[in-house]
Amino acid sequence: MTKDQNGTWEMESNENFEGYMKALDIDFATRKIAVRLTQTKIIVQDGDNFKTKTNSTFRNYDLDFTVGVEFDEHTKGLDGRNVKTLVTWEGNTLVCVQKGEKENRGWKQWVEGDKLYLELTCGDQVCRQVFKKK
């Protein structure tokens, strides 16, 4: 595993995305559209500074952060909530905690070989996404 997450990553699999979205109270119609989409992630990393773009034909979401620095995040590309977000390193894995009205919310992201792994959590729901480097 490596800490380097730079690159363009295309989605290969998206397990339990609907369950994750239900836990976020995302409406039925949006969930039905979103589960059929393929996402592309573009990550520009300079040490602990990240600029990320998640693109699909339905919605795009940009997130810029510095590891270890808490910030206010508006999750407009997903459920439209305001959360306090902190991303840290655990070994070579980025671990994000999002504090707000939903319990146990956040994500983990790491690279192994030419694959980017992302686990999204809300409540008791975990979505597992795998991306391949383009």
From Swiss-Prot:
Give an example GO biological process: retinoid metabolic process
Q: Which residues bind all-trans-retinol?
A: K41, Q109
- UniProt entry tagged with the keyword Cytoplasm: yes
Q: Which InterPro entries match?
A: Calycin, Fatty_acid-bd, ILBP, Lipocln_cytosolic_FA-bd_dom
Q: Which Pfam families match?
A: Lipocalin (PF00061)
Which Gene3D superfamilies does the UniProt record give?
A: 2.40.128.20
* First-listed, main subcellular location of the protein, grouped into a coarse class: cytoplasm
Q: Does the keyword Isomerase apply?
A: no
Q: Which UniProt keywords apply?
A: Cytoplasm, Retinol-binding, Transport, Vitamin A
* A GO cellular-component term linked to this record: nucleus
**Location of the protein in the cell:** Cytoplasm
Extract one GO molecular function annotation from the record.
retinol binding
PANTHER family, A to Z: FATTY ACID BINDING PROTEIN
Role noted for this protein = Intracellular transport of retinol.
Family, according to the entry, reads as follows: Belongs to the calycin superfamily. Fatty-acid binding protein (FABP) family.
What does the entry's free-text domain comment contain?
Forms a beta-barrel structure that accommodates hydrophobic ligands in its interior.
Q: What is the name listed in the Swiss-Prot or TrEMBL entry for this protein?
A: Retinol-binding protein 2
The gene that this protein is the product of is: Rbp2
